[in-house]
Design a protein with these regions (language model features):
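N-terminal leader/targeting and assembly helices and adjacent pre-domain segments
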Residues: 1-6
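Amphipathic interaction/junction segments at domain boundaries or subunit interfaces
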Residues: 10-110
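Short secondary-structure boundary/hinge segments and terminal tails
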Residues: 40, 144-146
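Short, hydrophobic/π-rich interface segment
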Residues: 84-137, 141-142
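Short acidic-glycine loop/turn motifs at beta-strand connectors
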Residues: 89, 154-155
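C-terminal edge-of-domain segments
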Residues: 147-154
Length: 156
């Protein structure tokens, strides 16, 4: 899957390598996570700016809702994620990820604490959809929840 390769090459492995290198060179966990946050937040802020283009369009929520399932299938395929669709209606788009390649690989490489940084980047990226679409989340696999929940709410 090219989508998986893209996640691995563009996001997962470079960040993981940077973090592991910092740790191997004596940087403590909290400090290493801060360095990684600074770097990954740059990409998340670029994504937020891209999201603003959609967020500023008329009927942004409807456009997002009509494309979200196809986007998820293409960019977050079953080989890396297990997606449970809960709602996709005129008020809310809600899905849960029960398996996530980021969580699986950070555990496999003995740095599960790094996964929360990837999750934080969702919050930054999706904030670009405001004010028409509000992103909410109650938990992630990385912070001990049984799944990562994604809620996109249509603004009133």
């Amino acid at each position: 899957y090219s989508a998986i390769q893209n996640h691995l090459q563009a996001n997962l492995f470079p960040t993981l390598a940077y973090y592991k290198t910092l740790r191997e060179n004596g940087i403590n966990q909290d400090e290493a996570l801060e360095y990684v946050r600074k770097e990954t937040h740059k990409a998340a802020n670029i994504k937020r700016e891209e999201m603003k283009k959609l967020g500023n369009m008329p009927f942004a929520y409807t456009i997002y809702r009509l494309g979200v399932k196809k986007h998820m299938r293409k960019n977050f395929p079953d080989t890396g994620w297990t997606t449970e669709w809960v709602k996709c209606n005129g008020k809310e788009i809600h899905f849960n990820l029960h398996k996530c390649i980021y969580w699986e690989l950070t555990k496999m490489y003995h740095c599960p604490e790094l996964c929360c940084v990837y999750c934080e980047n969702d919050d930054i990226s999706f904030s670009g959809l405001l004010p028409k679409i509000r992103f909410e989340r109650t938990g992630t696999l990385a912070n001990g929840s049984p799944y990562c929940d994604f809620h996109f709410l249509k603004a009133r």
